[in-house]
């Protein structure tokens, strides 16, 4: 924990928006994006560090805060507070999470089972949001964080859409091009299958094995009707791959089946081969 004098000095050196009248003391910038800035701040009442988000479009700030408040899930950062700055902009405070963005975490030499395990946890969180009528619309590795305690968090719900939003808001083109479903890029109304597309794009960056790429390609089909129809179906195919079973999206060749069989039953096969080699050696020694 940083000492009180050090916090005061750090705050004095940092020039941020005026937060007079709030319970927060700004310390530094945690991140910037097209929607606004996230600051590291100190909650002077509870004496703890928080992430304080301030965006330029108040309606979207309120939208994200409301969505986060209603989605109580281990994979979604909880909202602590919501309010208005002296200049009229809205802010909200959330738990300050320490960890790595998913793209940086994957670059640190994680094995395939670890990476796919994290991907499945992202799917679980997104499926939970879909069950509550929320479509994220900007899923990408940069918006997923792996925390220092192993938690996997889906961030940045500022452009998420809900059934209660206006048709114009739901059709607004938002997101990141390489993860954006075609219907989203065309400015059409989207449903949860736009997030399935984005998850498929994320999956492509995780592994280059044929079954995994087949899953990703199915999730990224141009037509929503050709994709997995929900996140649970996508996750189920990934789980089948991890369990050594055939995946629905991939038509296996004989060599693929043999390789999968070998991965699934590696230890028994090694034991049988060891036994056979030992028997052959024994027979050879007896007849020498």
Enumerate the predicted regions with their spans:
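Protein kinase glycine-rich loop
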Residues: 27-33, 38
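C-terminal lobe helix-coil module of Hanks-type protein kinase domains
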Residues: 42, 98, 117-120, 126-127, ...
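AlphaC helix of the eukaryotic protein kinase fold
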Residues: 56-70
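Conserved short submotifs of the Hanks-type protein kinase catalytic core
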Residues: 87-101
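AlphaC helix of the protein kinase catalytic domain
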Residues: 101-111
């Amino acid at each position: 924990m940083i000492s009180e004098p050090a916090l005061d000095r750090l705050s004095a050196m940092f020039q941020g928006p005026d937060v007079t009248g709030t319970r927060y003391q700004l310390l530094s910038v945690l991140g910037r994006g097209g929607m606004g800035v996230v600051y590291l701040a100190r909650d002077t009442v509870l004496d703890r560090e928080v992430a304080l988000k301030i965006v330029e479009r108040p309606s979207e700030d309120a939208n994200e805060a409301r969505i986060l408040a209603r989605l109580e899930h281990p994979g979604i950062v909880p909202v602590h507070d919501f309010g208005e700055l002296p200049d009229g902009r809205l802010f909200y405070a959330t738990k300050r999470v320490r960890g790595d963005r998913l793209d940086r975490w994957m670059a640190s030499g994680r094995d395939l089972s670890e990476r796919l395990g994290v991907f499945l946890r992202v799917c679980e969180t997104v499926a939970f949001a879909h069950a509550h009528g929320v479509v994220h619309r900007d899923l990408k590795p940069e918006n997923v964080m792996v925390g220092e305690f192993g938690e996997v968090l889906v961030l940045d719900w500022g452009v998420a859409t809900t059934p209660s939003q206006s048709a114009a808001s739901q059709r607004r083109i938002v997101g990141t091009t390489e993860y954006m479903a075609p219907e989203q890029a065309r400015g059409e109304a989207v449903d949860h299958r736009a997030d399935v597309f984005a998850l498929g794009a994320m999956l492509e960056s995780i592994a280059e094995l044929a079954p995994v790429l087949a899953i990703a390609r199915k999730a990224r089909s141009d037509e929503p009707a050709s994709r997995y129809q929900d996140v649970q179906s996508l996750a189920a195919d990934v789980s089948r791959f991890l369990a050594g079973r055939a995946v629905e999206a991939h038509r296996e060749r004989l060599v693929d089946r043999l390789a999968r069989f070998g991965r699934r039953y590696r230890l028994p096969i090694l034991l049988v081969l060891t036994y056979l080699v030992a028997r052959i050696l024994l027979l050879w020694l007896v007849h020498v």
